[in-house]
Amino acid sequence: MASPAPAPPAASSSAAGSAPPPRIGLAGLATMGQNLALNIAEKGFPISVYNRTAAKVDATVSRAEAEGALPVLGHRDPRGFVLSLSRPRTVVLLVQAGRAVDATIDALVPYLDAGDAIVDGGNEWYQNTERRIEEAAARGILYLGMGVSGGEEGARNGPSLMPGGHIDAYNNIRDILEKAAAQTEDGACVTFVGPGGAGNFVKMVHNGIEYGDMQLIAEAYDVLRRVGGLSNSEIADVFAEWNRGELESFLVEITADIFTVADPLDGSGGGGLVDKILDKTGMKGTGKWTVQQAAELAIAAPTIAASLDGRYLSGLKDERVAAAGVLEAEGMPSGLLETINVDKKMLVDRVRQALYASKICSYAQGMNLLRAKSVEKGWNLNLAELARIWKGGCIIRAKFLDRIKKAYDRNPELANLIVDREFAREMVQRQNAWRWVVARAVEAGISTPGMSASLSYFDTYRCSRLPANLIQAQRDLFGAHTYERIDRPGSFHTEWTKLARKSNGAAI
């Protein structure tokens, strides 16, 4: 049981002394944790903060004072931190996923009481959250795994929040989360996602869609640059213009900004910083988890998978440079395989259409994965509500999420976004431009794995008769796996080799 004698805070802002005891505390004061704590305090909720290193506690309290004397109480030991909170206590963790979460929980649990709650706001593997829910329940402690999206700026000014686990833990701080979350015309960008590890799983898929989005945008840039010869300044203008239309989104907006930034280390001031960045993309694992889950649930997610493969291949920088040298020595051109004379305005418009259609495929794949997992786990995920809370604060926030929400509102059992009437119409209208862009990229030798995978996904999904019949015949021949017929029910097996030899003999 917790002691009734909490230690005084090690440091606090001037406003904290007159504030009531906090209902909520936050442990883990790296960039995301510090900014979320200040966000909560700015919304009028006193908050206690704790970190293993005292310097980050002091830095957070100093920021709280500098940013408006926000009610933040800093603690340097877990006991004083926990006992500073009024009951039922809620402790938010924003530490590195995995062992660090378990270690932080172990440090805090001795001072928590039954009915208190732990909220893990990291990018955690959902099964770890489900394990911790059971462990916490054995002590009478409530637990939430809460996805937090929006990066540093979102954490400070309003993220998208995806909590899942014990609904009582959510209800205890619902008012706080609704104030701290990003706000749109449809309300706060937070909702109780579902039980168990639902919140972390939804955030994982959000990140998988994010991988796809970023890959598609990078491919659009590459085609504009290499086929159209657009300068960084022109590309900045293109993305800024796109952000005023159907492609309006956080990622398109920041892409436009990136192309306006000069290299601060270039004395001439003429070079773009983006051109000096090594072409190796980092990752933290959520994209890989998304692709693994899609495979386990038999959900096709080729756009997201292509984006993950793209990151893997980008990491092979030395191998790619060596391969280019070997192939050039054998006669492979070092530049474009084919020079394409194209009007820039037409190219920009067609790339816009290809990017939009490809993005729909990426979101469709993510939504289908969410539904499949929801069915498997009995989470009863509301896809329209998830689209709603992604409209603001998060990295994949986009104008067309409102239309995705409406599509699932119209039909919660929608098989695929591609067959929603509105999106279907747009896909058909854009397919010619989409095909043109992918074809020109192939002709020129420009890699567009995301757009190509998206187009193949679209063509495969709309095809009423695939060549899978031949694959099933092959499986039956070498493995006796049987097959179904289109003209009668049941499973069938054929002695293919015997019949083929007999047929070949008869032909001779």
UniProtKB/Swiss-Prot annotation:
Which keywords does UniProt give here? Chloroplast, Gluconate utilization, NADP, Oxidoreductase, Pentose shunt, Plastid, Transit peptide
Gene3D superfamilies according to UniProt: 6-Phosphogluconate Dehydrogenase, domain 3, N-(1-d-carboxylethyl)-l-norvaline Dehydrogenase, domain 2, NAD(P)-binding Rossmann-like Domain
Active site residues per record = 203 (proton acceptor), 210 (proton donor)
Name of a matching Pfam family: 6PGD
List its EC numbers: 1.1.1.44
Q: Where is this protein found?
A: Plastid, Chloroplast
* Residues where substrate binds: 123, 149-151, 206-207, 211, 284, 311, 475, 481
Q: Which domain of life is it from?
A: Eukaryota
Q: What family classification does the UniProt entry report for this protein?
A: Belongs to the 6-phosphogluconate dehydrogenase family.
Q: What does this protein do?
A: Catalyzes the oxidative decarboxylation of 6-phosphogluconate to ribulose 5-phosphate and CO(2), with concomitant reduction of NADP to NADPH.
Kindly provide the name given to this protein in its UniProt entry. 6-phosphogluconate dehydrogenase, decarboxylating 2, chloroplastic
Organism equals: Oryza sativa subsp. japonica
